[in-house]
Amino acid sequence: MSEPRPTAHYHLPGLFEFYDFYRVFLPLFRRHRSYFYDWCDIGSIYGAPADCLWGGGRVGSGTHDPREVLALMQEYDIEARLTFSNSLLRAEHLAEEACSELCRLFAASGGPPNGVIVHSELLLDYLRKTYPSLYFVSSTTKVLTDFALLRRELARPEFRYVVPDFRLNRAFDQLRALPDAYKAKVEFLCNECCWFGCADRRACYEAVSRKNLGEPGPECRCAAPDAAGGYRFSRAMENPGFIGVDAIQNTYLPMGFSNFKIEGRELGSALLLEFLLHYMTKPAYHLHVREEIYLDNMLDLF
């Protein structure tokens, strides 16, 4: 009897930020499943609403009603993850009512299990005690670039998944040597555009955390050689840490890894669509998906 084929679980950006996009894409994904690779699925969608004190990584911009967001996830049996990865939280911030209300809502959903992406140990301890039905993801904002630290994080039972820094994506010898239980917890950040040699990544995340807290502090000025151009998917593909669809299917899945995070909460929905075309859609159906989402014979670009 042949071994079951492994499945890649994608963790997609924009739970709140791209609600309107997913309201169109998810019915398409269900209705025309043959357009998409049968070896992958949507493991979760993550994000945070605007003005979210516990938020981190990016400044949230979503404003849609959380109940409608959760209802959409339940309708399509997809896990929702709250991105609460602020690294600078203090005890007084735990009383923030809007974030607590989100946790109460998502913890009591009764559908697929929902999670929280966290950085702060203080917040992790509080959420574990207060909302035990939620699971937890160790955030890439911890910038785990030392493999020994990654392995230690994977050993922590409180985390269901751990997102290492993208610069460990090609540490193949060490990744291959991980036990299966650890491999199941690794969630690779695939499409990072950050400069591979960046020494300011932690400071950048801390600047975002301060901004979400409404506190003054230095802005993080990107020192990458091509920073002025902003995010370009074509440039991300040239990053030494990039994981593309071929590598997922032919390298990472055979090694025993199955969880892949796509970044992009702060980008536009047109780029999100390009990510989904690259990672999930059979090339023969790229145009079909574009036509279903936005492309018609009256669309003008200029």
Question: For each of these PLM feature ranges, what is it?
Answer:
Residues 2-149, 153, 159-302:
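Active-site pocket-lining/capping segments in soluble small-molecule metabolic enzymes
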